[in-house]
Amino acid sequence: MKAVVLTVAVFFLTGSQARHFWQQDEPQSSWDRMKDFATVYLDAVKDSGRDYVTQFETSALGKQLNLKLLDNWDSLSSTVSKLREQIGPVTQEFWDKLEKDTVSLRQEMNKDLEEVKLKVQPYLDEFQKRWQEDVERYRQQVEPLGTELREGARQKLQELHEKLSPLGQELRDRARAHVDALRTHLAPYSDELRQRLAARLEALKESSSLADYQAKATEHLSALGEKAKPALEDLRQGLLPVLENLKMSFWSAVDEATKKLTTQ
């Protein structure tokens, strides 16, 4: 499971969409993000699960039981891959329809975000400028003290600490003041953005297109369920021999172990 968690974490860290608000990168579509995540996660589960099965089969207990789990795991992985291939086109059709139906709302929200970004950018620039100035001032104040320490003896450590403490406290106080000022400046724009979003969603809620979209979404989900039934049945049929083989191998191993215990 560590491999699964690590893979998912890397995916989200490298695939984060937060940067698109401040940069001009072209974000992935909802379908692309969902498809990439599903592929990465399932592959991670498959690979890590196979590793655990291999480790068990090569152990002393695994060799004694001889359950042939690795063969069953490969058969199960093949069946699941087939299911993904069959359902994939239907799912993609649903997401494409969802993106098309919500394009107007997304365009309006992107416009609102861009307007707010332009309004708050000067405050962000000012915050960055003041913070850099304070850090540089702190560095200039500390640099002579570092030279003094290198040239002095150990007994000056306490003296140096006493000199650094007020400077560090001053830097923290300045940073806290800058953050408070930035929060005060940004608060109206944050409220404005929330109000705009609420208005957009309320307008969407009251529009007749929402009811149409809900009906279309229900229709697409029903179609997805109908088209997925054959694939799910194939998965069930593929699992039956795997489970039966596993059960027979297990009981065979139990019988063999019982016989060995009886003869001892």
UniProtKB/Swiss-Prot annotation:
Main localization category: secreted
MF annotations from Gene Ontology:
cholesterol transfer activity; phosphatidylcholine-sterol O-acyltransferase activator activity; phospholipid binding; protein homodimerization activity
Location of region: 10 X approximate tandem repeats: 67-264
- Gene3D superfamilies on file: 1.20.5.20, 6.10.140.380, Apolipoprotein
Signal peptide limits: 1-18
Q: Where are the sequence repeats?
A: 67-88, 89-110, 111-121, 122-143, 144-165, 166-187, 188-207, 208-229, 230-240, 241-264
What does the entry's PTM section describe?
Glycosylated.
A Gene Ontology term for the protein's cellular component? extracellular vesicle
Could you tell me which residues carry Methionine sulfoxide?
M109
The record's function comment reads: Participates in the reverse transport of cholesterol from tissues to the liver for excretion by promoting cholesterol efflux from tissues and by acting as a cofactor for the lecithin cholesterol acyltransferase (LCAT). As part of the SPAP complex, activates spermatozoa motility.
* The protein's assembly and partners: Homodimer. Interacts with APOA1BP and CLU. Component of a sperm activating protein complex (SPAP), consisting of APOA1, an immunoglobulin heavy chain, an immunoglobulin light chain and albumin. Interacts with NDRG1. Interacts with SCGB3A2. Interacts with NAXE and YJEFN3.
Recorded hits in PANTHER family, A to Z, give:
APOLIPOPROTEIN, APOLIPOPROTEIN A-I
Name-wise, this protein is Apolipoprotein A-I
Kindly list the organism's lineage. Eukaryota, Metazoa, Chordata, Craniata, Vertebrata
Question: What gene name is listed for this protein?
Answer: ApoA1
